[in-house]
Amino acid sequence: MASFGWKRRIGEKVSKATSQQFEAEAADEKDAAENEDGNWLQASKRRKETLQEGCKQRSQQLKDEGAQLAENKRYKEAIQKWDEALQLTPGDATLYEMKSQVLLSLHEMFPAVHAAEMAVKRNPHSWEAWQTLGRAQLGLGEIVLAIRSFQIALHIYPMNPELWKEDLSWARKLQEQQKVAQRIENKEMPPEGPDLSPGSIPDYDFESDEIVAVCAAVAEKQKSVSANKTMVIVSASGTVEIVNEKEEGSSTPDGSVFIKAR
């Protein structure tokens, strides 16, 4: 008769050497997975760098093509090339600055100012961008802003004779002319006040009943005032007396006794 006994665990049958082999294989698989992850990250980084480098090269190619078109005065086509380049490298301040110059040649002042502002925003240390911005602002008549832009450009590159002799000097000359024109305009402007020109005086009908009645009332009042005159007489003792006298037959008191004051 077979005796009853507890079943042994399966793991107890696995030898120690076999267990170590399993652990080693698991570690190798883990290292391989980590290596694969690392390789994937490195490969992704390399692909990104390659893509960026390709974008830069293509952008530079489009920039050069646009510059060639601009030299041949094919401005619209040049702008299209630079817009394509900006899609690849949106942080390139030079593209915005070149685009602003071409827009100035096309007399599109507002877009030119906007493009120059974008160039300054991308690279505030570019004196070319500040110079182009100042010229675009002059095109809009913003002389004060243009002078400020030229001064910033000179602060970055103080040895540039073009900024001194052409840009800043011309802007200041325009500013002086603007001040003279304003002074002349202020002198020629008529003073504010009621308009007394002949055209502003209403044409009254002096033979109307209303005007005749008013004139008669004024004449009657003047007649009554001239008929009676009032005199204030102050005696030597200081007594004040008011006397109404007629125009005809009036007599003046003795000057030795009274002092007459009107």
UniProtKB/Swiss-Prot annotation:
The keyword Kinase does not apply. TPR repeats lie at residues 59-92, 93-126, 127-160. SMART domains: TPR. It comes from the Eukaryota. Residues 17-63 are annotated as: Disordered. Keywords: Phosphoprotein, Repeat, TPR repeat. InterPro entries: TPR-containing, TPR-like_helical_dom_sf, TPR_rpt. The modification Phosphoserine is found at S197. This is Tetratricopeptide repeat protein 33. It comes from Mus musculus (Mouse).
